[in-house]
Amino acid sequence: MNKFKNIAVYGGGSFGTSLASLAAQNCNNVTLFLRDEAIAKEILHNKTNVKYLGDIKLPAHLQATTNLDIIKDFELIIIALPSYAFDDSIKLLKTHSISKDNTLLIATKGFARNPTALLSDRLKTLLPYNPTAFFVGPNLAKELAKNLPASASIASLDIDIANKIAYNLSSKIFTTNVSSDIVTLQVAGALKNIFAIKSGIDLARKQGENARATLIVAALKEIAILSKALGGMQKNSDILLEGVVGDLVLTCYSLGSRNTKFGYELGISSDKKKFLQEYKELAEGREALKLVLDLIKKYNLHMPIISEVASCVIPYVIPAKAGMT
């Protein structure tokens, strides 16, 4: 199977930088594209991204730039940006003349906005001709950057594209599996952050490990409910992929997860309204909640965990008996 001659990663946060580090294990021509000139220079000269990854050393041959004009020259472009920036970022790529020859790997987790939709559906209107796949896995950014063992699922409607990307990213310590169910992986990647908030709240309440295991099972059921409503889950076994079960378990069990941390700090807060107003860190699950509520309403779905978290995080959106006091 052919190797990509070069790989671009678009997004210089913790996850984007970690994915660039991962890609550089197998490819000698990897460039990280980001907006912050100072961080780009730091990566070039010091091989660190202290703001997002501390003092973790990045591969010596990893390049970094703020010049999007050259991104069209890369065979594989990995998109690793927050979901709220997805539309604008893809439109920006279009202005820099990427063509149907550029393969896209979407590592963004969440839903497109205005209107609420799967990222794959939004791409059909923005970049309909590019080979596209989705990357979801149980991956804490700092562990990826440290080259610790991990895995991920690569999904594409074109299974040959998924296999090629998997081949280019896999190694002895990073394993991949492929799937054609792009819907289930996208849904799982978005919802797991909301379930992690619930896990953090339960941790603050000292609910115990039995409750957390029960949450995992219930969360998988809700992932399946929304996935089927959006056209996924043609095979029940798709729920067992690393990008579904693995990512859900990792996110819900780790305080290294921004969303679990957010839920925990919300749970121990004595003034929840003030906490929610003043909390500045990005918690993707908080961002995704209103979008998921749109889909629940549109398809008339019963997803009680999502409703409970909404009652905690978006006061008065849904009157739920299980809401926090």
UniProtKB/Swiss-Prot annotation:
Catalyzes the reduction of the glycolytic intermediate dihydroxyacetone phosphate (DHAP) to sn-glycerol 3-phosphate (G3P), the key precursor for phospholipid synthesis. Keywords: Cytoplasm, Lipid biosynthesis, Lipid metabolism, NAD, NADP, Nucleotide-binding, Oxidoreductase, Phospholipid biosynthesis, Phospholipid metabolism. HAMAP family: NAD_Glyc3P_dehydrog. It is an enzyme of class 1 (oxidoreductase). It comes from Rickettsia conorii (strain ATCC VR-613 / Malish 7). The gene is gpsA. Sn-glycerol 3-phosphate binds at residues 109, 137, 192, 247, 257-259. NCBIfam families: PRK00094.2-5. Its EC number is 1.1.1.94. This is Glycerol-3-phosphate dehydrogenase [NAD(P)+]. Transmembrane segments: none annotated.
